[in-house]
Amino acid sequence: YQSEHGDYSLEAYFGKVTIGRFNARLIANLDVPQDELEALTSHAVKRVKTEEGSTRWTLNADKQQEQGSRKIRTLSYIPDYSKLDADYIRQRFGEPESFSVVNETTQLWVYPQLGVRILIDTHGRELFEYISPAQFKLLEEKK
């Protein structure tokens, strides 16, 4: 995956999973240096441009297998159910340490002590992202 800004990332998509009463998509963002990520694009069997301007590659089966031993940087959980409002999240996680407005329908709530960031979207699906607390500090420092 290459963002519209040119940064590369490697995601492992686990498809739909059921956790508790929620069906969700589970995605692991793997820890790979940028130069290695760029080199991996030559092993793609498929390339897709997204509406946002990013590019998504699908690696061949051998390269997918090789990358499976990488450390997980973040783990994203995207429930199919899209009615998880701020009150529901506040009841389960408490008040966020910080939050920011992403756009008119979306807020980012940050819980560094838990290693959790939550995108709350009033017109779409929520996204829960887990980052180890040690990595969370590094990620926040890069901003």
Language-model-detected regions and their locations in the chain:
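A cross-family detector of function-defining hotspots
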Residues: 1-143
